């Protein structure tokens, strides 16, 4: 997501844009994120990292894109514990509130997904609750203007994590309590089961939203749409289809 945001900023504003990117991890000598003016390394929850962000461009920002996410996946959203949700929120949601409070920023853009489709309800775990928190925040009035890009399945840390956990669990399909998931792995290799699981997501997305197989180019186009409209709340992208909406996806309506 961060790459798509940077590319869209450069397309819209050219070299005039002054961009800082925060890389969640240890500093690697010689490594810089392409397209930005400054790369900052470290955990966004580290006070020193926040102070460095405040020192950039006199602490004034037109737009902040918050794409960092880390939380438990691979289990049903309904089975996420309060502890796992709190841990997921620590990096996936809570920093958004902190940054909005501490920075002088006009617009904050966060990211979500279609976590209420059947396949995601079965596997998105605590991250599903963090994404719901983001969507509820998106429709609230705040110090900054709020917006959210909601995307269909694409290759990401979360999707890789889900596949890795399912691959391990697939060795004993009887332990998969969800009948839909279990059907993908019974009598099949873990590789084949994962493939069928992904195909199931794509099929469900296409039936629900009109397209599927979201690519890096699609994410880039969604960011360009963000700049095109005056005050969008949700910019949805699923495959080549991009559309606006203004209501959050609430888990209570689907669980």
PLM regions: where:
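Canonical Rossmann dinucleotide-binding motif of NAD(H)/NADP(H)-dependent dehydrogenases/reductases
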Residues: 1-20
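Rossmann-fold cofactor-recognition segment
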Residues: 21-27, 31-49
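Conserved NAD(P)H cofactor-binding loop of Rossmann-fold oxidoreductase domains
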Residues: 64-74, 112-113
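Conserved mid-core segment of classical short-chain dehydrogenase/reductases
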Residues: 69-86
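Catalytic loop of short-chain dehydrogenase/reductase
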Residues: 87-89, 107-143, 150-182
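C-terminal helical subdomain
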Residues: 94, 148, 167-251
């Amino acid at each position: 997501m961060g790459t798509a945001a940077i590319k869209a900023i450069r397309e819209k504003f050219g070299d005039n844009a002054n961009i800082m990117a925060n890389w969640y991890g240890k500093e690697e000598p010689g490594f810089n994120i392409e397209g930005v003016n400054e790369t900052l390394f470290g955990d966004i929850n580290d006070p020193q990292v926040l102070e460095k962000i405040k020192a950039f461009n006199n602490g004034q920002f037109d737009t902040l894109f918050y794409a960092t996410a880390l939380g438990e996946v691979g289990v049903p959203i309904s089975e996420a514990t309060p502890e796992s949700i709190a841990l997921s929120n620590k990096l996936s949601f809570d920093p958004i509130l902190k940054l909005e409070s501490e920075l002088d920023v006009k617009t904050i853009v966060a990211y979500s997904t279609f976590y209420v489709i059947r396949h995601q309800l079965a596997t998105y775990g605590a991250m599903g609750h963090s994404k719901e928190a983001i969507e509820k925040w998106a429709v609230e009035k705040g110090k900054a203007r709020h917006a959210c890009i909601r995307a269909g399945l694409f290759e990401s840390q979360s999707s890789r994590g889900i596949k890795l956990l399912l691959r391990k669990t697939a060795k004993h399909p009887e332990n998969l309590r969800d009948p839909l998931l279990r059907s993908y792995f019974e009598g099949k290799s873990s590789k084949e089961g994962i493939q069928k699981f992904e195909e199931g997501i794509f099929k469900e997305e296409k039936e629900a939203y009109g397209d599927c197989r979201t690519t890096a180019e699609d994410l880039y186009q969604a960011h360009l749409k963000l700049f095109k409209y005056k005050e969008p709340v949700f910019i949805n992208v699923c495959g080549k289809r991009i559309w606006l909406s203004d209501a959050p996806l609430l888990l209570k309506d689907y669980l």
